[in-house]
Amino acid sequence: MNLARYRLNDESITSRAFAEMRTNGVCVLPGFITNEAIADIVREVEALAPLAHRSAPRRNPYLTAAKGANTHAVELHDSLEVLAYDHFDPEGTLRSLYECDDVLHFVRRCLGLDVLHRYADPFGALNVSIMRDGDVLDWHFDMTDFVVSIALQSAESGGDFENAANIRGNDNDDQVVAAVLRGDAQERVRIEPMTPGTLMLFNGRHSMHRVTPIKGMTPRFVALLAYDTKPGTDSTDALKLSRYGRLPSGRLA
């Protein structure tokens, strides 16, 4: 971590981050991870990449099956590969970062929470998305209140994180969502800077977002760090099979 720039116990930093989250639903902290640490993590991801599970789910913007009326009936698709928590070296840079209590408490204060726990999911507590040429993560809302991510490597072209902030929960949200999906509401969309080393806190439950199609031979790597206010949080077997292609050892689908 770049402790010269981000002192983890500095209340002015965490207070400013909390204010940005409350106002905009997103907080971007560039250069949070040092270049040396990013290089170490990228080397590990590249070595592990053959183990990643590729998926191409189809769903609507609310991450459910496309059915019903209006924007709930719009079918979108994703394509990406994912490395799971148990792929990574317990002594490696990325797992050490996720399992660091100082980082946990820094994130907790940035989110304005009294309590925060790491996920108990053996695959999804920490995972890395790998997006290659032609891959996309189309428009969607998250099912959780916040996502914590670290940008590791940018694609040659594309791979922008586009955010239509705070459009859910209003009386006309379906019309706004439809306009964004059509490309008719560019004034509502902004690109969040995700340069390597950036830590981003994001409330995707109310903000629709996407990753634009990847172009070129350099894949996009992003680490996702999973936390919850409740202890012992795990994902469903269905999600594990969809995202990681397997269940924990000894369990059958």
Cite the ranges covered by each PLM segment.
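Non-heme Fe(II)-dependent double-stranded beta-helix
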Residues: 1-11, 18, 22, 32-106, ...
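Catalytic core of non-heme Fe(II) oxygenases with the double-stranded beta-helix
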Residues: 104-199
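Short strand-connecting beta-turns/loops that link adjacent beta-strands
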Residues: 34, 144, 157, 216-217
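Short amphipathic
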Residues: 27-33, 193
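Phosphate/oxyanion-binding loops and surfaces in catalytic or ligand/nucleic-acid-binding neighborhoods
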Residues: 48-51, 155, 230
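Catalytic core of Fe(II)/2-oxoglutarate
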Residues: 162-166, 171-253
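Short beta-strand segments enriched in hydrophobic/aromatic residues
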Residues: 45, 152, 227-229
